[in-house]
Amino acid sequence: VVDIGGGTTEIAVISLGGLVQQDSIRTAGDVFTSDIQYYLRQQHNIRVGEITAEKIKWAVGAVIPDLDEEPEPFIVRGPNLMTAHPVEATITHQEIAHCLDKSIAKIENSILHVLETTPPELYSDIVENGIYLSGGGALLRGLAKRFTDKVNIQFHVADDPLHAVARGTCEALKHTDHYQFLMR
């Protein structure tokens, strides 16, 4: 499981009711938002706030430049950094894929590290069943494809990835007798 939340990305291999291998990194949605703000300052000379950067992330957020269904470009307005005059810029998903590249690569490296340290007996199960993506970051266009291409294991976006962790926690709390390992 790879859960890309706001503050952290959690990568975990779970087997037979237990946590086998895991990693946690502070590269996640909040960093993506900051990446977008920085990119707009550097490439478009425009300053945007966190809320606007979030809107851009949801509207045209992508991690690969070639998508089957391309979103419409996002028009952003803000002050020019030099003159403070209002300016407008059209932002494409290709630009966002470019500006998120380094952060996504950090997550890929963490996934590879977890897989490298996973016992070989479990590795074949992972290859057979794939890896599930959850959290808001899982909604970035092209993420499952990029990870699949990088790791050569199929990645799947969980149903309702924004709430998957909360639903799983609720289920575990309903059936604590089956999930005692979670209560440690």
Regions from the PLM with identified roles:
Residues V1-Q21, D68, R141:
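Gly/Thr-rich phosphate-binding beta-strand-loop-beta motif of the actin/hexokinase/Hsp70
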Residues D3, I36, I111, L133, ...:
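Residue-level signature of catalytic and energy-coupling elements of molecular machines
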Residues L16-D101, L112:
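Phosphate-binding glycine-rich/basic clefts of nucleotide- and phosphate-handling proteins
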Residues G18-V20, S124-N129, V151-Q154:
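Short, surface-exposed connector motifs at secondary-structure boundaries
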Residues G49, A53, D68, E171-R184:
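Acidic, glycine/GT-rich loop-and beta-edge segments that sit at the periphery of enzyme/chaperone cores
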Residues C99-V127, A172-T176:
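Phosphate/ATP-binding catalytic cores across multiple sugar-kinase/actin-like superfamilies
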Residues Y123-F147:
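Glycine-rich phosphate-binding loops at beta-strand->alpha-helix junctions
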Residues K145-E171, Y179-R184:
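Conserved phosphate-binding/catalytic loops in two-lobed NTP-binding clefts
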